[in-house]
């Protein structure tokens, strides 16, 4: 049982109130095994935990990233997505959980074009090194997105993108957090640009759920201001909305 392991106290608290989103994604044995690994890592290491595994059911690689957030309330998600983008990964789905006051437990399902030419273990270790560097050295330069080379005709003309980007704020569901929903067309490094924009605007991401379907992406963020208050000011909402729309329109390098 978990009680028989010398686990990090924050992990014990996490286990007492395990989010349903994590329970649905794992069998009990797999979840306990992962929690043991995370607990042992957090007990012996001050830095973040990063591990990956090929998920055949999703045709993707699932990365689990766990860290004590400490005083860092802004920019963690942005650094993770930038690290993935720098490695040439496309994020298909993500669940970002804030547990208690200090522990972040994030899961990402990514498409990795290099996996066919590489041993999965070495490739996953390489990606985790980039992620760990980005998180454990928060003052380091943000990883640079990998340049995407496009062949002629591979890029959809802007006229094909018929639906406008939508950015919605919901302050009715919760009184302590704002639900920020975003719907747009996917492109390389998009999530990295979105999360970087939120970080620059001092928007704190408490929870995130990312889904892609064909060429479209739906992002749902539970967010607050730096002081923990919901984002209710209409002018601030408009500033965030305009910045996100500009980030979506940012040309791919």
Model-derived features with residue positions:
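Regulatory modules associated with amino-acid/nitrogen control
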Residues: 1-253
């Amino acid at each position: 049982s978990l009680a028989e392991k010398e686990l990090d106290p924050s992990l014990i608290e996490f286990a007492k109130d395990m989010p349903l989103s994590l329970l649905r994604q794992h069998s009990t044995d797999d979840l306990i095994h992962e929690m043991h690994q995370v607990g042992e890592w957090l007990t012996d290491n001050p830095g973040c935990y990063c591990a990956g595994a090929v998920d055949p059911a999703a045709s993707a690689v699932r990365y689990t990233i766990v860290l004590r957030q400490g005083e860092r309330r802004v920019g963690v998600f942005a650094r993770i997505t930038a690290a993935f983008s720098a490695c040439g990964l496309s994020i298909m789905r993500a669940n970002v959980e804030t547990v208690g006051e200090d522990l972040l437990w994030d899961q990402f399902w990514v498409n990795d074009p290099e996996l066919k030419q590489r041993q999965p273990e070495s490739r996953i270790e390489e990606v985790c090194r980039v992620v760990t560097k980005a998180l454990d050295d928060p003052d380091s330069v943000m990883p640079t997105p990998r340049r995407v080379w496009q062949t002629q005709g591979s890029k959809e003309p802007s006229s094909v993108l018929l639906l406008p980007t939508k950015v919605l704020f919901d302050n009715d569901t919760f009184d302590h957090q704002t639900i920020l929903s975003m719907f747009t067309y996917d492109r390389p490094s998009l999530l990295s640009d979105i999360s970087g924009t939120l970080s620059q605007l001092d928007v704190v991401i408490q929870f995130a759920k990312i889904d892609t379907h064909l060429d479209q992406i739906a992002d749902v963020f539970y967010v607050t201001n730096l002081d923990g208050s919901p984002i209710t000011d209409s002018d601030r909402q408009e500033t965030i909305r305009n910045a996100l729309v500009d980030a979506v329109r940012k040309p791919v390098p």
